[in-house]
Amino acid sequence: MRIGISCHSTAGGSGILATELGIALAKRGHTIHFVTTEPLFRLRGFYANIFCHTVNLVPYPLFRHLPFTLALSTKMFEVAKEHDIELWHVHYAIPYAACAVIAREMMPKDQRFHIVTTLHGTDITLVGRDPSFEPVITFSIERSNGVTAVSESLKRDTYEHFPVKREIRVIPNFVCVDQYPQAPDP
């Protein structure tokens, strides 16, 4: 399968989780295309079926702030079209799921990819509590083909604070214990 993944590229939990998931999927034979703002903190080494695309943020005098969401949506669209992406996995409803929805809508109808959104705490418990973000978070969740949350409490909070009807599946964060062997007990 040809899979796009978008996440924060920094050392935070969602970026680590998304990168490790991409590596695991690549090891199973899938082709992974990461779209991020900078090289992934966690991606070390070379994988023949992992590709990284960076979002080009061009300063534009009219805008006070760089139009990140527009640039991200465009890059997702370009990668999806050029590489025939079948599934896009995004970490965070905003901005990533919202941008994936825009990118998918730009695609010809017969080439539209599925979107899986993984919700993390900031989506729901911090940024999501601001009423100005509720409509776009709800829209992005509802327009996703699948939605996961990293904990039962996050799933409950999502249903409590957003008028979401889509099923949310809990997939807890994981750590590959083989990468971190325990020292023997003294």
Model-assigned labels for residue ranges:
Residues 1-3:
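Extreme N-terminal starter segment of soluble prokaryotic enzymes
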Residues 5-11, 23-68:
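N-terminal strand-loop element at the rim of the active site
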Residues 8, 119-122, 172-173:
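Histidine-centered beta-alpha loop that forms part of the nucleotide-sugar donor binding/catalytic region
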Residues 13-21, 132:
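Conserved alpha-helical elements of sugar-nucleotide-dependent glycosyltransferases
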Residues 71, 108-116, 122-142, 156, ...:
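Nucleotide-sugar donor phosphate/pyrophosphate-binding loop at the beta->alpha transition
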Residues 72, 85-112:
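An aromatic- and histidine-rich active-site surface loop
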Residues 142-152:
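A short beta-strand/loop micro-motif in the catalytic core of glycosyltransferases
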Residues 153, 174:
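Carbohydrate-associated surface elements
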